[in-house]
């Protein structure tokens, strides 16, 4: 499931470090978290969609790697991202 352009733009503006930032870990984690939430809602009605479930696990693993990178490089930004996005870790 892809994000709509407006939804993606809204996520970007809320998590950018500067005006043209699209690749910082904070932005990537926020985008992945939104996609994970969308897929989780999808699975509430489509329990046997195993192909998409594999995609969900891939997204969760990618977000986990980005969070680990952010924790190791800048713990303050890491804590801020966890609080802002409500991620339990």
Curated annotation (Swiss-Prot):
Biological-process GO terms, alphabetical: translation
Keyword Lipid metabolism recorded: no
MF-aspect GO terms: rRNA binding; structural constituent of ribosome
Pfam families: Ribosomal_S15
UniProt cross-references to InterPro entries, sorted A to Z: Ribosomal_uS15, Ribosomal_uS15_bac-type, uS15_NS1_RNA-bd_sf
Top-level taxon of origin: Bacteria
Keywords assigned by UniProt, alphabetized: Ribonucleoprotein, Ribosomal protein, RNA-binding, rRNA-binding
GO cellular component labels: cytosolic small ribosomal subunit
SMART domains with a match to the protein in the record: Ribosomal_S15 (SM01387)
Function: One of the primary rRNA binding proteins, it binds directly to 16S rRNA where it helps nucleate assembly of the platform of the 30S subunit by binding and bridging several RNA helices of the 16S rRNA. Forms an intersubunit bridge (bridge B4) with the 23S rRNA of the 50S subunit in the ribosome.
HAMAP family: Ribosomal_uS15_B
UniProt record similarity statement: Belongs to the universal ribosomal protein uS15 family.
Quaternary structure annotation from Swiss-Prot or TrEMBL: Part of the 30S ribosomal subunit. Forms a bridge to the 50S subunit in the 70S ribosome, contacting the 23S rRNA.
Listed name of the protein: Small ribosomal subunit protein uS15
Organism: Solibacter usitatus (strain Ellin6076)
Gene label: rpsO
